[in-house]
Amino acid sequence: DLMNDLMSLGIHRIWKEQFLDWMAPRETHHLLDLAGGTGDIGLNFLKRGGGITTIADLNFKMLSTGQKKITNKKFNQRLNWINCNGEKLPFNDEEFDLVSISFGLRNVTEKDVALGEIYRVLKKGGRFMCLEFSKVNISSLSVLYRFWSNNVIPFLGEKVSGNRKNYEYLIESIK
């Protein structure tokens, strides 16, 4: 979470708020948040009045970290944490009103398979929402973005988390 703030200068929080606005959570909605990590999207979905959230991630450690940060115990009844692969979802057909993935689709090996699984588990009329990085098309910003991405983010990764390579991979995965 700290690294997300540092890497994006806090802008990721604005993106996520807008993402949740577009979701328009309702009490009757069941959300599947893929690559849900520590639960930022899923927990905020509940705080905004969503019904049930299932947070799914391949990384068990991220899910465990997310479970520890829950301060509102009433959410436990409406929250599921599932360690699974987005390319082979362990859910019934047409189970979810919404499926979201934020900053995770670029890490999926077989995107077409994962998108097929998302379609399978979405209810008819359900919505898939994806928040992801993309190329910067404004040339003046592009120069700054490349400098920040190639120099500052790996440096921050090394100083804050002790792992420069993970953040070099992150930048490559965005390209």
Description of each model-found segment:
Residues 87-99:
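A short acidic, Gly/Pro-enriched loop at the edge of an enzyme's catalytic core
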Residues 57-60, 110, 133:
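Short beta->alpha hinge that forms the Motif I/post-I loop of the SAM-binding pocket
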Residues 9-29:
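Conserved alpha-helix/loop element of class I SAM-dependent methyltransferases that forms part
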Residues 30-88:
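Class I SAM-dependent methyltransferase SAM/SAH-binding core
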Residues 97-110:
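A short SAM/SAH-binding and catalytic strip from SAM-dependent methyltransferases
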Residues 112-127:
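A short glycine-rich, Lys/Arg-flanked "PGG" loop and its adjoining helix->strand segment in the class I
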Residues 1-9:
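Class I SAM-dependent methyltransferase Rossmann-like catalytic core
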Residues 58, 135-175:
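C-terminal alpha-helical "lid/dimerization" subdomain adjacent to the S-adenosyl-L-methionine
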